[in-house]
Curated annotation (Swiss-Prot):
Present with 13600 molecules/cell in log phase SD medium. There are 2 genes for eL42 in yeast. It comes from Saccharomyces cerevisiae (strain ATCC 204508 / S288c) (Baker's yeast). In wild-type cells, 78% of L42 is monomethylated at both Lys-40 and Lys-55, and 22% are a mixture of species with either residue monomethylated. This is Large ribosomal subunit protein eL42A. Component of the large ribosomal subunit (LSU). Mature yeast ribosomes consist of a small (40S) and a large (60S) subunit. The 40S small subunit contains 1 molecule of ribosomal RNA (18S rRNA) and 33 different proteins (encoded by 57 genes). The large 60S subunit contains 3 rRNA molecules (25S, 5.8S and 5S rRNA) and 46 different proteins (encoded by 81 genes). Keywords: Antibiotic resistance, Cycloheximide resistance, Cytoplasm, Methylation, Ribonucleoprotein, Ribosomal protein. Its main location: cytoplasm. GO terms for molecular function: structural constituent of ribosome. One of its GO terms (cellular component) is cytosolic large ribosomal subunit. Gene3D superfamilies: 3.10.450.80. The gene is RPL42A.
Amino acid sequence: MVNVPKTRKTYCKGKTCRKHTQHKVTQYKAGKASLFAQGKRRYDRKQSGFGGQTKPVFHKKAKTTKKVVLRLECVKCKTRAQLTLKRCKHFELGGEKKQKGQALQF
């Protein structure tokens, strides 16, 4: 279980800051894939008509988790940076700190 606080003081690369400032932490989420990207247009054109599936469908999935990516936004200059964490099954943002001698809760 990885628990990350919602704010963190870290270095800001922004042109106005260039020093350690407070950052707001959120979890990165991939955007919606565009229908007009060249590869998608080509794939849709190839798929249309008769002939079934034209490209291999991936089945050999090996990983059980994804790496967690944090999005750090500077409170002062709004510059955003991304930070990759290690793989984990349970990720929590801004959860309660755990006390000594207590059982884990999911």
